[in-house]
Each structure stands twice: as C-alpha cells, then as structure tokens.
Amino acid sequence: MNLRVLWLLSIAQFLSMQVWFNFSAIMPLVQEQWQLSSTQSGIIVATFHLGYVLAVIFYSFASDKYNPKYSFAYGSLVAGISGLLFAAFAEGFWSAMILRLLSGIGIAGVYVPGMKMVAQLSPPASRGKAMGIFVGSLVVGSGFSLFVSGVLQNAWGWQGVILVTSCAAILSCALILMSKIPVVSLSSTPVTLALLKKIVAKKNLLVNFGYAGHCWELYAMWAWIGPFMVYFYQQKGIADALTWGNLSASSIVMIGGIATYFGGMLSDRWGNVRAIRLFILLSIACSFSIGWMLLAPIWLVVAVALLYGFTIIADSPIYNKAIADITDPEVLGVALGVQSVLGFSFTIISPAVFGLFLDHGNWGVAFTVIALGTLITPFCMRALQAAEVPLERS
C-alpha cells in the first residue's frame, strides 16, 4: 500500500476520532453541573454508539457502490458540526443525548469506509500491519480528547474541550476532500442472497461474535477509565485530580496506538486466532482486577491500567483483518459493516450497564460485570480453532 495514502487516512481519522470520547473527557464536569447520575452518563455515551449502529450499514452499502472517500469526508463533517452544536446548546441529559446521537451517525461514515480503503489498497501479506496503523489512529485520536481535556478544562471549561475536538473533525473533512486517494474496487454486482449467505457463514459469525465481546469490554473501559482515574486520584488526595485523571486516562488509551500496530503485525506472523487469544485473555484479567485496586499504590494501579490500555485494543484490527481475509471483495464493505453493527450493538449497552452497576455497586463490581461479558470472545476463538476454520487465505 502507498504509505502516503495510509498515513493520510490515518491522520484524517485521528482528527475525526477526537469527537468519539470528548464527552467522556468532560463527564466528571457535566455530571456535577447537570446533576447526572452515572447511569444517565452511561446512557449518553451509549447513545453515540446507537447513532453509529443506525448509520453504519448505510455507509457500508454506499462504500461498496460509491467512492468511500466521500463517506469518510461527510461523516467527519457531520460529527464536527454536531460537536459544535453540543458546545453551544447542550444543557442537560436530553439535549446531550440527541446531539451525541448525531455525532455517532457522523463517525459511522469514517471508520468502516476508511477500513475498506485500507483493506483493499493493502497486499494480503502486510494487511494486518496496515490495518493496525489505521486502527491505531482511531485509538490515539480517541485518547487525545482526554489529553485536550486535561490541558484546557481549567482555562476553557468543558465547552472549550468540545469546541477544539469538534473543529478537528471538520479539519479532517477538508483534508480528505483536498487529497488524491486511489479509488478502490467498487461493486456493480447486486447484493444477492448467495452473497449475503457468505457474510453470515459460520466462520464470519464466530469472528464477529468474538469482535462483539471485544467491543463490549473496550468501549465500556474507554468510556469510564477517565472518571475512574479521577476518582482514584481523589481518593489518594491528589491535588487537581480532574486534570491528572484525564491526563493519565489519555496515556492509558493512547498507548493502544502502539498496541494495534503490534497486534496487526503479530497476526501476520502468528495467525489471527492465536494473536486474539493472547490479548483478550490479558485484557479480561485486567478487567477483573483493576476496579478492586483502589487501595493499591498509585504506581501499581497506573501500571495495570497501562497494561489494560495496551491489551484491550491490540486485537482490534485482527477482527477486521480476519473478515477481510475471508470475504469476497465485492461485499467487503457490507461484511465490515455487519461486523461493525454487531460489535457496536454491544457498545450501546455496556457503558450504560457499567454506569448502572457503579450506581448500585462500586468500581470493582462494574469492571467485573464487563469482564464477564467479554468471556464470549475466547469461547468463539476456541470454537474457531476446534472447527479448524482457516482465517487466512493461503
């Protein structure tokens, strides 16, 4: 793949994805200002994912028929404008929920069309590495909004954080529209029942349900790791815990930018199932433990959190690569869309479930519930191996 194109798409996605978790970055501030419960905050986070799921199938079909560059650009624009409206008009639970729904609809136009371009422009031998770089830009972009919050919140307030991150998404739109990106293969073949059966074949379903378990854990953790670190530092008596909590959370999320490259590269060498199993078991172990560590030393909690941030995302590009490896090119956009819908349907639930158990339990219970839901993924990987389903083309 042309490295210039790969880095162009990755930089554009980095800019767009700052919208994804900018609400999580300001959550401790608006919870206090708007008198939100943890359950309500989790629902606002989940509403973004609902918008994503509602829109992603449309974008997936469109990316198989039309140049996905334009889905990417206009999705970024919608995400950015909805963020500007959030900064100007959000004043409570309902307005925040509606505007975050619009942001999710916009971001749906970025990830799957971008992944289709990367998958089809990459040779199979290095596809895992290329997709790892692209997913890494999602990770770093998502985490960067936490960094922006840590730096700007005291001077500019939560509105300033939303404003800066939303303008980044609008800049992404301009960057894509002004750039020359090779046109990937577009399908003139109608989507038939026979083609759809390939998308829902056993091997696809096992990969996709494994991905769903991964998404359940990942997006609950990403949504709540900032508030968790803020709370942890408050319990330790750290001055300006809000700033340090968000800065720590940004490091925890952004370390995943390295992890996705490493995970993609490892899948090229080890195979998909083996690489997924390594990372998912480590991240589940972190989910089971971190919420119960509030009395542990700061250095130990930060170390476990960094391991958590690395392992929880390292396998993410591998699920995308696995689908790309086993899917006919003419329906790749739809296949990636189906995977995304299934995975992100779980993310509509998990942040809200986390908030519910946090309201009625504690951090340990909330993280443990997330870990239990993630156990579906190693079971799916075991089923794939037992059935000897090949996940790489020979």
Q: Which residues make up each language-model segment?
A:
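Helix-loop-helix hairpin linking two adjacent transmembrane segments in secondary transporters
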Residues: 133-177
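Cytoplasmic membrane-interface "Motif A"-like loop-to-helix N-cap segments
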Residues: 65-75, 268-281
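C-terminal ends and interior cores of transmembrane alpha-helices
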Residues: 77-91, 282-295
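Conserved MFS/SLC helix-loop-helix module at the cytosolic interface between two early adjacent transmembrane helices
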Residues: 54-90
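Cytoplasmic helix-loop-helix junction between adjacent transmembrane helices
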Residues: 99-137
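C-terminal transmembrane helical hairpin of 12-TM major facilitator-type secondary transporters
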Residues: 271-319
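Residue-level signature of mid-helix packing/kink "hotspots" within the transmembrane helices
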Residues: 21, 49-57, 142-143, 253-261, ...
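Extracytoplasmic gate region of multi-pass secondary transporters
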Residues: 23-24, 205-257
